Amino acid sequence: MKMKKLFVALMAVAMLLASECTSNAGIRKSVNKSRINALVEELRQEARAEGIKSERESLTLPGIKLVSENNLDVVSIGSLGISFIKLGAKKSIEDAEDLRTARALFKGIKKLMIVSYDECSQELRERFNRKVARTLNGCELILEAKDEGEAVSIYGTTSRDGSRISDIVMFAPDDGALICFFGTIDAARLGELAASAGKIEGSVKDI
């Protein structure tokens, strides 16, 4: 999964929101979190049904679940897991400002989900992409970018004054990646997320 590209796109969202004073959120439907969760579970079941075997690795901690199986990687972190991430950030991030950024960023997040399905069969990837695209159709498209022909679309619900953004979904069908931040984030912090992405990622490993 090309995480760097996705986080760069997220930083671009911050720049976009900073320049906009109004939002079209009122005429857009909200992201259907339940449907997206259901689609990911369907993807896992279909990957198992394909019979493509790969070494299964899993890690389950309070509020954190990481599963790698059938050429599919799923990371699901709930509210309790977010608390552990904050603790990990405190240990691994030495710069005080970066630490404040990381903790403030995750303050409003209720769930973080990362799905990497780029190694699944082409048929399965395309089917999942169609389902996700239909689910996101009509939601607020905050940013769409292309790099070397590969598209990244970012959806969410912005407040009318553009200061907050809820339920961010980063969808990169060509890369086989789906990242969801369920909850509400201060839009001003999004660019800082991109800048601190590597340090925040390291905090998860230190849990």
Question: Where do the language-model regions lie?
Answer:
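Small-residue-enriched, tightly packed secondary-structure blocks
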Residues: 105, 148-151, 178-179
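Bacterial N-terminal signal peptides
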Residues: 9-18
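A short, solvent-exposed beta-edge/loop patch
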Residues: 155-190
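Bacterial N-terminal signal peptides that target proteins for export
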Residues: 1-8
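Short Gly/Thr-rich strand-loop-strand
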Residues: 129-159, 205-207
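Early exported N-terminus immediately downstream of N-terminal targeting peptides
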Residues: 28, 32-127
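Boundary at the C-terminal end of the N-terminal hydrophobic targeting segment
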Residues: 18-19, 23-25, 49
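C-terminal partner/receptor-binding element of secreted or periplasmic proteins
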Residues: 184-207
